[in-house]
Amino acid sequence: MSNESKCPFSGHNSKPQVTVGGGTANLHWWPNQLRVDLLNQHSERSNPLGKDFNYRQEFKKLDYYALKADIKNVLTDSQDWWPADWGNYTGLFIRLAWHAAGTYRMGDGRGGAGRGQQRFAPLNSWPDNASLDKARRLLWPVKQKYGQKISWADLFILAGNIALESSGFRTFGFGAGREDVWEPDNDVNWGDEKEWLAHRNSEALAGSNLAATEMGLIYVNPEGPQASGDPRSAAPFIRATFGNMAMDDEEIVALIAGGHTLGKTHGAAPADHVQADPEGAPIEQMGFGWANSYGTGVGKDAITSGLEVIWSQTPTQWSNYFFENLFKYEWVQERSPAGAIQWVAADAEAIIPDPFDPSIKRKPTMLTTDLTLRFDPEFEKISRRFLNDPQAFANAFARAWFKLTHRDMGPKARYLGPEVPTEDLIWQDPLPAASATPSSASIADAKAKIVALGLPAGELVSLAWASASTFRGGDKRGGANGARIALSPQREWEVNKKAVETLTKIEELKASTQLSLADLIVLAGNVGVEQAAQAAGFNITVPFAPGRVDALQSQTDVESFQLLLGLADGFRNWKKQGVNTPAEVLLIDKAQQLTLTAPELTALIGGLRVLGTNWDGSQHGVFTQQVGVLSTDFFTNLLDMSNVWAPVDSTSEVFEGKDRKSGTVKFTATRNDLVFGSNSILRALAEVYAQADGKEKFVQDFVAAWTKVMNLDRFDLA
């Protein structure tokens, strides 16, 4: 054997010699490792636009109607590399927008169209998103022309709207404001399945945050549960998946029928002709996936879902043909050319136009889940009403489509553009219009009155935290603006019991000040932080931005807001009974929803503990003899090797810290507390504040993180 053949760097070995980030990863050895890394997603280091880029300002420079005209032109500019059905990409762009938005789930607010995630794995390569790589590439010349004035996230949804409008449909409106990110959202739990299209039961779906019946689908299997071809058994799965998106029966019927009024599915041949998805495709395919070896691989030979269905006689024009055909004909099960289960109108004439040969006509076809709208009793009632009242159907679809594509955007204050509807919708969590901004004198007066109450700093801080910490970065819901802690359901939450006692005292001040209750609550928290910092020897002023308003109960959907409670708030050492997920995992989840970094999480926990803000007044994690002082005692005592820790029972939820020599119990703690000494990353951060020179930095960092949380929902400050 030659020396060259033996050399590991000669280039002749089949295995790569160097792989950055390769090799056996930490998660292989420790699969339950805490995902602190999720708090460092979407940092400035991954953003090519820099920290000073302001999408809202950039969008205002956009010639909006010129953009719309250019997108409309794309619809009928058929490309040889992906020929348009009937010379029109309407159906493709509707599907693009639908599938961009359809990953949203109201349970945790994650998913949805708001960040342009369909550009990245796994969504760019989900089986249900086959061929949408072509739709995104069709839009590239438009994106290239308008640059950063329009985000990909907004472009996906706007393209769907324009496709509907080009068909003669009148949409409810459009709000821009979705800002792109530059890497996948790794915090989203898409499910535990390890195979594409692995099935989930409807009971599991109803109790989860998952938005699809199978791994890699947007909603449900169009062939019925586990490709059973049974329309009736599909109903509970449809309700569960759409219900997890906050859609009711009428919205479900409208969305399915409206989405299937235009376009077609593609299943010219069996799936064994289809090659790798975009993430797994060879480099020379340049981000395209699902190469098709059947015939030309495109146009009449295209394979996407494997189904070959056209619902309407006018597949590029809005109509009521979906319902007319659904109820007019008797449907017989058949197999598509790809072998998928679908249905054909056995007693119909050939009235459906072929997408590429005008001399050919087909019989109407439907999906198994389309027939569910006829054979499920409740869906059938709604469907017949829409059959007999096309305008009611059009109106219901317009509103449901708007909700689908905007549900994850949060309050209407975030919407941009000339087509934002004026009507306030309950799912937007509407707020009253703001009045005049309070003067500096009125703020100072209110601050003095809060101080005069003589309440402990921890109580003031606890109230403000309870109000602000409902915010979810995924769908921009919750937060302190609106003072909804004073309304149902938040006022009745167990975790808010002590905070509401303080709230009652703050409410009594409102009439004598010029501030809203929402502003008073945050100002009270700031007062508490300032008092605690002063007690630690630091005179600081916590930044305060007035202008919050107070929501009405009529503006608050109780059922929807109940979801903001979540499973735990580790910042207050609260965890819902019966939840078996480790507390520290839920703490990371909460911190990620609050858009906190790992250092911000660490500073906040350390400060909240020494201020005594546990939801029930317990001493867990209160590692100090001077409660109410913004000290670094939490960190110094946590890392003190004279203490030894042990669980108090077999649940390992609560722990005692004893003096290593005497055995005297000094402290108690939860997993939320000890993780800052146990986890190597969080311990490294805790050490920064436990050091002799960490006191002032801790106060500064706590105040900065505190102010961030108080202002998370202040979109008017952007």
UniProtKB/Swiss-Prot annotation:
Residues reported in the UniProt entry to bind heme b: H260
Residue(s) of cross-link: Tryptophyl-tyrosyl-methioninium (Tyr-Met) (with W-98): Y219-M245
UniProt-listed InterPro entries: Catalase_peroxidase (IPR000763), Haem_peroxidase (IPR002016), Haem_peroxidase_sf (IPR010255), Peroxidases_AS (IPR019794)
CC annotations in GO: cytosol
Cofactor list: heme b
Cross-link Tryptophyl-tyrosyl-methioninium (Trp-Tyr) (with M-245) placement: W98-Y219
UniProt superkingdom: Bacteria
Pfam family, one: peroxidase
Enzyme class: oxidoreductase
Keyword Oxidoreductase among record annotations: yes
PANTHER family named among the record's database cross-references: CATALASE-PEROXIDASE (PTHR30555:SF0), HYDROPEROXIDASE I, BIFUNCTIONAL CATALASE-PEROXIDASE (PTHR30555)
Entry protein name: Catalase-peroxidase
Biological source species: Acinetobacter baumannii (strain AYE)
